[in-house]
Curated annotation (Swiss-Prot):
Keyword Cytoplasm: no
One of the record's GO cellular component terms: cytosol
Binding site residues for Mg(2+): 39, 68
Biological role: Pyrophosphatase that catalyzes the hydrolysis of nucleoside triphosphates to their monophosphate derivatives, with a high preference for the non-canonical purine nucleotides XTP (xanthosine triphosphate), dITP (deoxyinosine triphosphate) and ITP. Seems to function as a house-cleaning enzyme that removes non-canonical purine nucleotides from the nucleotide pool, thus preventing their incorporation into DNA/RNA and avoiding chromosomal lesions.
SUPFAM superfamilies cross-referenced by the UniProt entry: ITPase-like
Quaternary structure annotation from Swiss-Prot or TrEMBL: Homodimer.
Descriptive protein name: dITP/XTP pyrophosphatase
Cofactor binding, per record: Binds 1 Mg(2+) ion per subunit.
Active site as annotated: 68
Residue sites binding substrate per the record: 8-13, 69, 149-152, 172, 177-178
Organism: Staphylococcus aureus (strain N315)
GO MF assignments: dITP diphosphatase activity; ITP diphosphatase activity; metal ion binding; nucleotide binding; ribonucleoside triphosphate phosphatase activity; XTP diphosphatase activity
């Protein structure tokens, strides 16, 4: 069985990859390097994902997958972007990030936004590959729903007439930015199998 190493300490992400890649042995990097951490010094999701996957691939001499993701709000020139997890400051809660975003948007009528996920795959004998997924929506006027995490309670998906937090895990999994990026990664891996 082929192995996929995920350059993340986030068990939720690792579990998502395990479900999506049942034919692979999926392990988190902390199982191999307990204190692995890469400072995200890039200015884009792509740069940060590549920093993580290339550092992990070099440390392990193995093929590694990493991702970087976040929310971009058009009226805020793409904020919070790469700072999505720490928009209100280091170690602040999802609630604090949401509050800052809603306050900054105020009564702005242009509430278009997108979730972005960039997955990068690096290895010792390969050029780094990058796969980007997005999901478009709008920022709601308040929080709705109990599911999900992060900005899900305020990310409204017009075609479903619900926020991400009002969707079941299965519904969100079918349309999410991470799912879209993983679909591209899967297509690439399937193509590699058939070569």
């Amino acid at each position: 069985m082929k192995e996929i190493v995920i350059a993340s300490n986030n068990q939720g992400k690792i579990n998502d990859f395990k479900v999506i890649f049942p034919d692979y042995h999926v392990i988190g990097i902390s199982e191999l390097i307990p204190d692995f951490d890469v400072e995200e010094t890039g200015s884009t999701f792509e740069e940060n994902a590549i920093l993580k996957s290339e550092a992990a691939a070099k440390a392990l001499n193995k093929t590694v997958i990493a991702d970087d993701s976040g929310l971009e709000v058009f009226a805020l020139n793409g904020e919070p972007g790469i700072y999505s997890a720490r928009y209100a400051g280091e170690n602040k809660s999802d609630e604090a990030n949401i509050e800052k975003l809603l306050n900054k948007l105020g009564n702005t009528t242009d509430r278009r936004a997108q979730f972005v996920c960039v997955i990068s795959m690096s290895g010792p004998d390969m050029e780094t590959k990058v796969f980007k997924g997005t999901v478009s929506g709008e920022i709601a006027d308040g929080k709705y729903g109990e599911n999900g995490f992060g900005y899900d309670p305020i990310f409204y998906v017009p075609k479903l007439d619900k926020t991400m937090a009002q969707l079941s895990k299965e519904q969100k999994g079918q349309i999410s930015h991470r799912r879209n990026a993983i679909n591209l990664l899967q297509a690439f891996l399937e193509g590699e199998k058939n070569v």
